[in-house]
Amino acid sequence: MPVLHNRISNDALKARMLAETEPRTTISFYKYFTIVDPQSTRDALYQMFTSLNVFGRVYLAREGINAQISVPQSQVAAFREQLYAFDPALNGLRLNIALDDDGKSFWVLRMKVRERIVADGIDDPNFDASDVGEYLKAAEVNAMLDDPDAVFIDMRNHYEYEVGHFENALEIPADTFREQLPKAVEMMQEHRDKKIVMYCTGGIRCEKASAWMKHNGFNKVWHIEGGIIEYARKAREQGLPVRFIGKNFVFDERMGERISDEVIAHCHQCGAPCDSHTNCKNDGCHLLFIQCPACAEKFKGCCSELCCEESSLPEEEQRRRRAGRENGNKIFNKSRGRLNTQLGIPDPAE
């Protein structure tokens, strides 16, 4: 029987990855297309990825595939060839290559079947996800940024927007993509005559969001081809001004790709200029927040003195304390509300 799941501990896998000498390339891709049997497709892809020593995070659903992976450089060509041959819908698929890559983005392959590759909360049977807005390439993005009739909408999370975004882009104040979709429609009701440009990290969220806006009667809708990653790459290759300011947050060990030299965020503990995210070292917290080097030393990588004290306790006592708390999303979520409560940061909406 083929091995279809990882059987090695995370610590061992991470140590193995860190000991590797061959460089790796971080790649992301997505495709909306019909997968009749997501589970069997998942199992076949898992075997293929494993044979090429690919690490990463992959989600499959009946609506398509969403992947962020790390591929040994010697296997990139073979990976591309095998992926393109796997299904006609994947032939020629755009692969977003990381802009700022240390080759240590992932250390294990996790591949899961989900209801949706992006949790959108849409249950309207008349919604056509294939009726998307028009793509914009790098030069067209810059032209739109100079168009007074264009509004750029950032379809990412608050912690992504905080460290980097396009000039004058509109942030949708919500904690999840499913909450952002109706709010984007609501916020743009008075601007139906405007040109709407939607963007996200790699294109998967803004593509669906553009279809949702069209479904709700907006006719002038665009989205950035390949998201921030492809925009920045093409702008640099073509010698164009890069109009994205700051850092592009990514969902792997790097937690960010430097796009411009500007640091537009601040340490959540002391207020110093900083755009480096980290997770609280207290295993009972793991809050995602921005922490400067000085505060990292002062608080030992924790988000508060309380967490610092708790993380210094014997492991058995830490486990005992964690056992009495709620877990899952209620503790480990990345919501703005939890961040503000934990660190005493004023809510910008208030």
UniProtKB/Swiss-Prot annotation:
It is an enzyme of class 1 (oxidoreductase). Catalyzes oxygen-dependent 5-hydroxyuridine (ho5U) modification at position 34 in tRNAs. The active site is at 200 (cysteine persulfide intermediate). PANTHER family: TRNA URIDINE(34) HYDROXYLASE, UPF0176 PROTEIN YCEA. The gene is trhO. Belongs to the TrhO family. It comes from Citrobacter koseri (strain ATCC BAA-895 / CDC 4225-83 / SGSC4696). Residues 146-240 form the Rhodanese domain. It holds the Pfam family Rhodanese. This is tRNA uridine(34) hydroxylase. NCBIfam families: PRK00142.1-1. Residues 314-350 are annotated as: Disordered. GO terms for molecular function: oxidoreductase activity, acting on paired donors, with incorporation or reduction of molecular oxygen. Keywords: Oxidoreductase, tRNA processing.
